[in-house]
């Protein structure tokens, strides 16, 4: 914290006015950068005129993965520190005017869907955890395969997750 306040030219009291500790600032930065990724993906989605929740979700996932594939330092920063708790905190805190209201936009996409899904927050959690945990090694190390080879499997898995969350779905029969 001493290095941060010295480089920023502010007093420690000022730092602690805005952040609880160094982990709080890290989490806010991760949340902000992740929000930027989702915001850019949402802008691209609107420009694409893709309809249907499933197709929109796949588009957003691909858009974000494409960006992370070209910016491995951003991937390293976000993925190593990404947790549901960071997202959850970002959803619950009062966002700045500049922050993208990702969770609300996600709920809006769900509301426009012809399909009703149970537990929207749990659905989002499951997809974020799947994508972030499995794509990291594919992008940075091409392990166990490169991202291009992995994507079809990722998308089919997302489709299975969506099927499992359909309201009234008999998961035993899926």
Map each language-model feature to its residues.
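Hydrophobic alpha-helical connector segments
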Residues: 28, 42-70, 124-127
